[in-house]
Amino acid sequence: MAAKPVVVGVDGSEEALRAVEWAAQEAERRKAPLRIVTVAAMPPRMRPSNEGPEGVANELLKSSTDALDASVARAGEVAPGLITDADLLSGQPDQAIADSGSGAQLLVVGARGMSGFVALVLGSVSRYVASHAPCPVVVVRHDADAPAADGEIVVGVRESMAASEAVAFAFEEAALRGADLVAVHAWHGSGGEQHATSILTETLSEWRDKYPAVAARPEAVSGHPGHVLADYSARAALVVIGRHGAPGAGHAIGSAPHTLLGHARGPVAIVPCES
């Protein structure tokens, strides 16, 4: 059976090309094909009337195909020999990109996109995708002082998360990279640290047996989960956090993931969790 693909959404911006680089490297690690997607959809205020102008639509179509071509070329530079295909999607950009994650191992988008009417995939759309896609979503941010790709994998641990999909994803990622894993629980209030330590011990005991080669350590930290994990992102190769609730069950992604996406200095994985 063929491996499920890694999917990346693009819009022609440099930020999108950096997301392509991240996705291509991840697909190579996972021995998976890479699928690059963009959306040919015109914002309502710019849709031509029955009389025209069709030139605007043609320009948008050309921009979309150019974005795909540039992305395929960049993926080939980063991971020569990687099986790559490109698809031009239709429909509402946010929903189309989120839906492209169906059957994928993960879906990658950039934190920001282009300005103007061709900004179809990234920026605000990335938050919609992170809260609605049926698979893990990685939002790639490349700041000037972004952490090295060979850093630790950090995962935020909530209470009763021993079987969490987010923890499973983090351990798998650490194993693929040969990286250390840091399990973090943010706490506050009297007795919070002791309770946090208990949660982390319970969580790691199960996953250490499944991934004995992964060096994992617990860290209980006082503070808001989103801000605590954002601080860790300064040195992490990837920060992983769970998204609770069914895909499409509302536009709110949750306080901690929302805060983390707004303040992280490196890539963030948002993993849908059933529990």
Predicted feature residues:
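Structural beta-alpha unit
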Residues: 1-2, 15, 55-58, 73-107, ...
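Small/aliphatic-rich secondary-structure junction motif
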Residues: 1-54, 151-195, 201-219, 238, ...
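Short glycine/serine/threonine/alanine-rich loop segments
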Residues: 31-33, 82, 135, 179-180, ...
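Generic structural signal for helix capping and beta-alpha/helix-loop junctions
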Residues: 44-46, 96, 147, 191, ...
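A short acidic, glycine-rich active-site loop
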Residues: 54-66
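N-terminal membrane-insertion helices
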Residues: 64, 68, 72, 197-200, ...
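Hydrophobic alpha-helical segments and helix pairs
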Residues: 99-144
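Glycine-rich, Arg-bearing micro-motifs that act as flexible, cationic patches
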Residues: 109-128, 150, 218, 238-263
